[in-house]
Amino acid sequence: MSSLKIKLVKGRAGKDKRQLATLDALDLTRKDKVVIKPDNPQIRGMIRTVHHLVEWEEIDS
């Protein structure tokens, strides 16, 4: 099963509540933090919501 490596590359300041809630759900609490999440439609949807704030890539786990 593959996973996604997600990194917050832009700060959280000035973002709307929906974007902040999505970043919290992804556990991206500060700039340059990296998390590994399972590759599923829910996580992909969260990435789509904050695509302009994060970088992500697929990894094999």
From Swiss-Prot:
Gene3D superfamilies documented for this protein: Ribosomal protein L30, ferredoxin-like fold domain
Taxonomic lineage: Bacteria, Thermotogati, Thermotogota, Thermotogae, Petrotogales
UniProt xrefs under CDD domains: Ribosomal_L30
UniProt GO MF annotations: structural constituent of ribosome
Descriptive protein name: Large ribosomal subunit protein uL30
Family matches, as SUPFAM superfamilies: Ribosomal protein L30p/L7e
Gene behind this protein: rpmD
Species the sequence originates in: Petrotoga mobilis (strain DSM 10674 / SJ95)
Family named by the database record: Belongs to the universal ribosomal protein uL30 family.
InterPro entries: Ribo_uL30_ferredoxin-like_sf, Ribosomal_uL30_bac-type, Ribosomal_uL30_ferredoxin-like
GO BP, sorted A to Z: translation
Keywords for the protein's UniProt record, in alphabetical order: Ribonucleoprotein, Ribosomal protein
